[in-house]
Amino acid sequence: MSRFLICSFALVLLYPAGIDMYLVGLPRIAADLNASEAQLHIAFSVYLAGMAAAMLFAGKMADRSGRKPVAIPGSALFIIASVFCSLAETSTLFLAGRFLQGLGAGCCYVVAFAILRDTLDDRRRAKVLSLLNGITCIIPVLAPVLGHLIMLKFPWQSLFWAMAMMGIAVLMLSLFILKETRPASPAASDKPRENSESLLNRFFLSRVVITTLSVSVILTFVNTSPVLLMEIMGFERGEYATIMALTAGVSMTFSFSTPFALGIFKPRTLMITSQVLFLAAGITLAVSPSHAVSLFGITLICAGFSVGFGVAMSQALGPFSLRAGVASSTLGIAQVCGSSLWIWLAAVVGIGAWNMLIGILIACSIVSLLLIMFVAPGRPVAAHEEIHHHA
């Protein structure tokens, strides 16, 4: 079992590493490519667009051909794209490389969640996804630090060579450690069960909405945090970095505590707790009389996301034993596109950073609480399948 957990964690971590590691080198990248930093900030959106594009086909391929046939080319593409970015001499080529990086990371991301659905029952999957969420929270803190250390001795291109090395490690794991987990193709008599795993299932759709809103909350916070903390609250850049490191610490603490909480409380209880924390955070930020209270509200955001997201993802994947790849893709596309759409629309309409965050917190909590209380799971399905090792 440990091989599947190690491979799944490695496959997922390409996604945040591709976002965070290069940011520290952005000024030098812009100077060398004769582009402004503002022009290159679109590289974040281009990367997410690549991920979303990969998710359109990766899930279906993983269900038809297997997990390894998607993980291997996905990690290989991430390696090639990282090298391409390091060799880029214009901003256009650099952005093209970032899109390809997103394609590779998206393939690996989808496969990771499909593997966990294949190999773990509901309760263990919820615990593992909570742990995975905690590990993912470490990357935004460690990646810029690692990038800074690399750039003390080497040019910015070395950041992408470091990403390529990460991709090589994932490729080696996919080739030599990961074993195929896709359930054997169903017999004709099992076709009705395959067809019953509909993406239009009310319970699945409710969890898609909940996880998409939750991701929108956390990405809104990440995107607005420089404005909130430095421009509105007046913190210096060093203080901002310290606060963000502390919020990552809060996220990790609650993520690593959630598996123990699942041994005591029902998953539904933790999901309700998560949304209550979001609601409390929104109210706290709305009425905050001081910076200290506002910072407390921010910690509630991190705690709420960490307590509930892994549980909600596990519940979303639960009904799908034969279509776990497609379900994972659907979740990923909804989360990436939904959160990006909200942030874009709020910016176009002219909603300020503070109100943008408060609005999504309150909307997420109210909608999610209603869905948790009134949309119950359908008929029980097999928690997980026996692993068939394909030649």
Swiss-Prot record:
Cytoplasmic side: 1-3, 59-75, 120-130, 179-202, 266-268, 314-330, 377-391
GO molecular function: transmembrane transporter activity
Periplasmic side: 25-37, 97-98, 152-157, 223-244, 290-292, 352-355
InterPro entries: MFS, MFS_dom, MFS_Efflux_Transporters, MFS_trans_sf, Multidrug-R_MdtL
Gene3D superfamilies: Multidrug resistance protein D (1.20.1720.10)
Topology relative to the membrane: Multi-pass membrane protein
Cysteine disulfide partners in this protein: none
Keyword set, alphabetical order: Cell inner membrane, Cell membrane, Membrane, Transmembrane, Transmembrane helix, Transport
Cellular location(s): Cell inner membrane
CDD domains: MFS_MdfA_MDR_like
Parts of the chain that traverse the membrane: 4-24, 38-58, 76-96, 99-119, 131-151, 158-178, 203-222, 245-265, 269-289, 293-313, 331-351, 356-376
NCBIfam families in alphabetical order: PRK10473.1
Similarity section: Belongs to the major facilitator superfamily. DHA1 family. MdtL (TC 2.A.1.2.22) subfamily.
Protein name, UniProt field: Multidrug resistance protein MdtL
Organism whose genome encodes this protein: Shigella flexneri serotype 5b (strain 8401)
Gene of this entry: mdtL
